[in-house]
Regions:
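Juxtamembrane/disordered regions of integral membrane proteins
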Residues: 1-124
Length: 124
C-alpha cells in the first residue's frame, strides 16, 4: 500500500508540475495583480495540499476501485471548490483562470489514475 501511495504521489506531482510550468506566466501575472507582489510558494502548506489531494485520489478512486470518470469528477469537484472560492473572495480572480483550474483538476486526477493503473497493472 505504501509503495502504491508513493508511486501515485510521484505521478501526481510530476503531472501537476508539468502543467504549472506551462501556465506559470498566467498565474504569475494574475497573482502580481491581486496581491501586488510575485508568487511565493510556502513549503508546508504546499506539501499539506498535495497530501490531501493525493490521499483523496487514493482513497476514493484507487482503493475503492473507482472508474476513470469517477477520477475525473473527483478532481473537477475538488478543484471546482478551489476555483469558485477564489472567484468569490478575490475581485480580480479571472473567470478564465477559474475555468482552467476547474478543468485541470479533472484532467489531473484522470491522467494520474490512468498512468498509475497502467504502471501497476491494477484494476479499477
Amino acid at each position: 500500500m505504501i509503495k502504491n501511495i508513493i508511486l501515485l504521489a510521484i505521478i501526481f506531482v510530476l503531472v501537476d508540475a508539468g502543467f504549472i510550468f506551462l501556465i506559470r506566466n498566467t498565474y504569475q501575472n494574475m497573482i502580481q495583480k491581486i496581491q501586488g507582489s510575485s508568487l511565493k510558494m510556502k513549503l508546508v502548506p504546499t506539501i499539506a495540499c498535495y497530501v490531501i489531494l493525493i490521499s483523496s485520489l487514493y482513497y476514493f478512486i484507487i482503493h475503492k476501485k473507482g472508474s476513470y470518470l469517477d477520477a475525473f469528477l473527483l478532481g473537477l469537484f475538488i478543484y471546482g471548490v478551489y476555483s469558485t472560492t477564489n472567484m468569490a473572495i478575490f475581485k480580480d480572480w479571472p473567470l478564465k483562470v477559474g475555468l482552467i483550474d476547474l478543468t485541470w483538476g479533472g484532467f489531473l486526477f484522470l491522467i494520474t489514475t490512468y498512468l498509475f493503473v497502467n504502471l501497476t497493472k491494477k484494476q479499477i
